[in-house]
């Protein structure tokens, strides 16, 4: 009986140790909810999940690096670079100040494919530097962070990018069954990563 209690105590202690951050976040959420009852309102929860969804997708991308004891400091800058590219490709035809005046208005899926392909090349460069040149991930991605930031500034000239395709901008406001599209995208990406990590040889 005592051995069982000790085993259960160790299991509980190990679980709490492995999930300390989650427990702390839940505790903070409960405290904020008690202080501000409107915090748990449906509207606020939807807005909260909508704002977190983009960061959640970035975190999922970095999770693979962390699982393999690596890191990726360039993810934040790369997300900003992706946003700049997406806005440039999503500009409407004939818009004033258009980066590529002769380029027709691209559909949203085409914009996504182009941006993902370009950012994948940057990620491939990170992987090659770490794997073949044996540079520490911290150093390699820190350098890539600055490179991406510099390219973004030079490419856009620090100017605002406007006149975007309405089908592209509607992603931030449209809903499906009352749930914002951004949240659905985050859930789909999360499902893909779950499948990768749990059902594929590479993930396991």
Stretches found by the model and what they are:
Residues 64-67, 95-103, 156-166:
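A cytosolic-side transmembrane-helix exit/cap motif
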Residues 2-59, 95-110:
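Membrane-interfacial amphipathic/re-entrant helices at transmembrane-helix boundaries
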Residues 133, 137-202:
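Transmembrane helix-bundle core of multi-pass membrane transporters
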Residues 31-35, 39-93, 128-135:
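Single transmembrane alpha-helix segments in multi-pass membrane proteins
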Residues 19-23, 48, 55, 77-81, ...:
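Hydrophobic alpha-helical transmembrane segments
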Residues 64, 88, 121-132, 155, ...:
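Membrane-interface helix caps of multi-pass small-molecule transporters
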Residues 21-34, 62, 87, 116-119, ...:
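Hydrophobic core segments of alpha-helical transmembrane domains in multi-pass membrane transport
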